[in-house]
Amino acid sequence: IVQDMALRRMNLPVELHASTQAATRTPEQALFLERCGFARVILERALSLDEIRTIRAACGVDLECFVHGAICVGYSGRCFLSRSMSERSGNRGACSQPCRLTYDLVDESGRTVVKGRHLLSVRDLNLSDRIGELIDAGITSFKIEGRLKDIGYIKNVVSYYRQRIDRALASRPGFCRSSVGELSLIHISEPT
């Protein structure tokens, strides 16, 4: 999974997937990446179903989209907040997620208007009820954010989505799972 287009010149012996950091949100961008030899494009998080359908109609590359996790306040690959507040760059896959912290909103006179609220990331992405629509729009792979999450959280969220995807595929002849294996839905507590 790459953002840096120079890597394609290295003729790596692996299938190239364009990272969400490439901020692909138009048919032209997806078609360009396909012509550059990318097998899969991970789409920008904030696309509508109509935008996804338009991209699907323009190219044949596999399309992947985020279905669960943080809703980024900026375009993926275009955020500099993490790097400016810490030594970790979100554009290099090491986001410290400062947008998920609480902040105070202060007006121009210095008066606090809002105190200690989640002003930049007000909710999380959860498209579990839209899996069928995403499949119908042309999505071939789903992405669940797991960075900075514990193993129990990841296992439970992935198991839940596995059930939702299987249910959606059962009503769509011609579609099937591309992976094998089973995950069980079990809560795992992390020791403190």
Would you name each region that the model predicts?
Residues 2-10:
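N-terminal cofactor/phosphate-binding cores enriched in small/glycine residues
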Residues 184-192:
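Residue-level detector of conserved catalytic or cofactor/ligand-binding positions
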Residues 8, 15-140, 148, 154-157, ...:
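Catalytic alpha/beta core domains of metabolic enzymes, predominantly
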